[in-house]
Regions:
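Conserved ABC ATPase "signature" region
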Residues: 104, 108, 115-133
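Catalytic Walker B motif of ABC-type/P-loop ATPase nucleotide-binding domains
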Residues: 162-166
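Helical segment within the ABC ATPase nucleotide-binding domain
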Residues: 176-188
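A short, surface-exposed alpha-helical micro-motif characterized by mixed small hydrophobic
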Residues: 202-204
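ABC ATPase "signature
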Residues: 220-221
Length: 245
């Protein structure tokens, strides 16, 4: 067994984040290994984005430990960040830049050089199907293309772990299908955690569900078990939250 297979690629150990007396998340724990695609499911405001920001080192936990590929993201963030690609829901894309400009900028920031830099840019442009918009201003692209530009940017340094916050939010059905296909392809050899409150996304992309409600992990298991005893995903959502979806 390889080191990647042995070591959890994403690990939350008793994560809590407090703002005064309010617990945005409380005692959240789970592990994801190489090749897993997990959907972080829950209603708006449940704690999905907060957990992701703590996992990626953008927020420090009030308690607990977040690890990426074995690296503590509070004390060893740089080492963990080299293994991580993080796509926030509304990441900065610099609307006056073209996708080519943006990818060159981030490739330089990641220390990619020469032939390797050119090859990586070419590979992510192909993977994310950006070839015919590569020279257009990002601000003039559709939301679907902007999302693909963001995905290409986080893939440049060949991360082992991808964390994506609402990757299909605001996309039309065709764009959603394309993003889903890309994520499934990437999940063959990477570890992916994606947040959503859209139940169809769970069945379409993820083999595992992490369901969070009011800052606490309410379910962690296979997608098939989430819809247990013949219940639909909508029924399980209501059962766990008391809310319709």
């Amino acid at each position: 067994m390889t080191d990647k297979a042995k070591t959890p690629m994403i690990e939350a150990i008793g994560l809590s984040k407090y703002y005064g007396d309010f617990a945005a998340i409380e005692n959240v724990s789970f592990k994801l290994h190489q090749g897993e695609i997990a959907a972080f499911l829950g209603p708006n405001g449940a704690g999905k984005s907060t957990t992701m920001k703590v996992l990626t080192g953008y927020l420090s936990p009030s308690a607990g430990v977040a690890k990426i590929a074995g690296h503590d993201m509070n004390t060893d963030r740089l080492a963990g960040a080299t293994r991580l690609g993080y796509l926030p829901e509304n990441g900065p894309l610099y609307p006056d830049m073209t996708p080519r400009d943006l990818l060159n900028f981030f490739a330089d920031a990641r220390g990619l050089e020469g032939k390797h830099k050119r090859e990586r840019i070419e590979e992510v442009v192909h993977l994310c199907d950006l070839g015919h918009v590569i020279g257009k201003a990002i601000g003039k692209l559709s939301r679907g293309y902007r999302q693909r530009v963001g995905m290409a940017q986080v893939l440049l340094h060949e991360p082992d772990v991808l964390i994506m916050d609402e990757p299909t939010a605001g996309l039309d059905p065709n764009q959603i299908r394309e993003v889903r296909n890309t994520i499934r392809k990437l999940g063959e050899n990477k570890t992916i955690l994606l947040s959503t409150h859209i139940l169809q996304e769970v069945q379409a992309m993820a083999s595992r569900v992490l369901f969070i409600n009011e800052g606490k992990l309410a379910f962690d298991g296979p997608t098939a078990e989430f819809a247990r005893q013949g219940a639909s995903l909508d029924e399980r959502f209501y059962e766990l939250t008391g809310q319709t979806h």
